[in-house]
Structures are given as structure tokens and as C-alpha cells.
């Protein structure tokens, strides 16, 4: 469909119930209220769980909830069929059992064990440029500076507040944990290579101050046109 009028005509047919079978993507769920259906089938329902983002289970669960809501109530004969190879995953189990508390408790437990929000604060760092080797080297240098600044003694000097160790969550010393560098899941975008670093901190301000100090150092030693350093505090997207 290339014209808005064509899309509008299609939605009107769906609203009037002119078709017995509707095949669509997640776009159907974004449109708003739809007439309920006797049978809803979801192909590869677990596909979103493989996205390299700590929120992937949460997003998948809510997307599937919206899809399930398209089915008539069970008492009226409504049915939902999910295709999945991860039937034991808590997002799938919570959906199958219609138990939101199951999903919440399992998700919070997993995030706490791995050191992800809401247990800790995250800062996502992105290094990009047109020269792949230069981007990799810059990301490696930034991670090394972050690691040096993340030592308990140094990090404690960057903030007037007393920092708490993150060790109870991840079994590592110090108030910060530096993950990476690693190629971004989207390794190249608009001609620019991309590497990422993830900073974890129990104290949000401590992480911000360490990153602020190191990014200034990196920008002084790298020309901005060749290498770009992006900082995303409490990121919504991880890639």
C-alpha cells in the first residue's frame, strides 16, 4: 500500500468484519482497537526474546498480550495458538497461564542476578566512525580508561557521596562494572562502523561523573569528524 487512502480502505474492511482470515504483522496491534476473533495464531512468538536487549522479554510479553487480546474470551470459544521453541521461558509461561505476577517475579529475579535495571543504572556508550579499525581502537581505549576510573579508589574521588559496591550483584569489586567494548548489534549504519560499551552502576551519579571525565579525554585525543562518542544514560534502546 503506497497511498493513505488504500490503508484507510483496508482498515475499514477489517472493522466491518468483511474478511474471515486476517494475516498481518505487529502493525495490526499498533492501530488501536480491533474486532475480536475466534482464533488467533502467533508464528514464532518467541522471536523477540533473542534481541540483545535486557528488555526483550518485557517487550515480547506485552506484544503477545496485545495479540492475545484480539481473541474472543475463552468462554465464548476464543482460542490462541502460539508457535514457540522456548515454551519454558517465563514470558511464554506467564502468557499461557494468564499470570502477570509470574512474569514480574521471574523478570525481576533475572535482572537482579545479572545486574540490570531496576537493580542498577545503565549508561550505554557508542563509538562510531568511517574507519572500522580506528573505531575499534578508540572503543578499546575508552573502555580501558573507564576501567581505570572505575576502581574503588578512583571512583570514590569523583563523587562526594559514598559509593556502594556493586559486588553483591555481580561478584566483582568496585562501584562500577564496564562491559565491552564489542561491535554493536547494528555494526554499520549510514556508512559508520559502531562499537559499544556498557557501564553499570548502583549510584547513577557516580557512573555519570566517570563517563563525563573519560569522554572529555577521548574527545581531546580524537578528531570529532573521524570518531564520534555518544553517551546514553538510562537507555531505552540497547543497539
Locations of regions flagged by a protein language model:
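Accessory helical-bundle/CTD segments and flexible terminal tails appended to RecA-like ATPase motors
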Residues: 3, 9-17, 28-52, 66-154, ...
Amino acid at each position: 500500500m503506497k497511498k493513505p487512502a488504500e490503508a484507510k480502505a483496508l482498515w475499514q474492511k477489517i472493522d466491518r468484519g468483511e474478511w474471515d482470515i486476517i494475516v498481518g504483522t505487529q502493525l495490526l496491534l499498533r492501530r488501536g482497537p480491533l474486532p475480536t476473533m475466534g482464533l488467533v495464531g502467533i508464528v514464532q512468538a518467541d522471536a523477540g526474546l533473542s534481541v540483545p536487549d535486557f528488555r526483550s522479554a518485557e517487550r515480547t510479553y506485552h506484544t503477545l498480550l496485545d495479540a492475545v487480546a484480539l481473541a474472543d474470551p475463552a468462554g465464548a470459544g476464543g482460542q490462541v495458538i502460539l508457535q514457540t521453541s522456548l515454551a519454558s521461558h517465563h514470558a511464554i509461561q506467564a502468557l499461557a497461564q494468564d499470570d502477570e505476577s509470574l512474569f514480574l517475579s521471574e523478570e525481576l529475579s533475572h535482572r537482579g542476578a545479572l545486574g540490570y535495571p531496576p537493580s542498577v543504572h545503565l549508561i550505554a556508550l557508542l563509538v562510531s566512525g568511517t574507519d572500522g579499525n580506528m573505531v575499534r581502537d578508540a572503543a578499546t581505549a575508552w573502555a580501558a580508561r573507564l576501567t581505570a576510573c572505575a576502581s574503588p579508589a578512583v571512583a570514590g574521588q569523583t563523587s562526594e557521596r559514598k559509593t556502594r559496591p556493586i559486588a553483591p550483584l555481580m561478584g566483582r569489586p568496585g562501584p562500577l562494572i564496564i562491559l565491552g567494548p564489542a561491535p554493536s548489534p547494528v555494526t554499520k549504519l549510514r556508512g559508520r562502523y559502531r562499537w559499544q560499551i556498557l557501564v553499570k552502576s548502583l549510584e547513577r551519579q557516580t557512573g555519570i561523573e566517570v563517563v563525563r571525565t573519560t569522554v572529555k579525554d577521548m574527545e581531546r585525543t580524537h578528531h570529532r569528524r573521524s570518531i564520534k562518542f555518544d553517551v546514553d544514560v538510562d537507555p531505552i534502546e540497547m543497539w
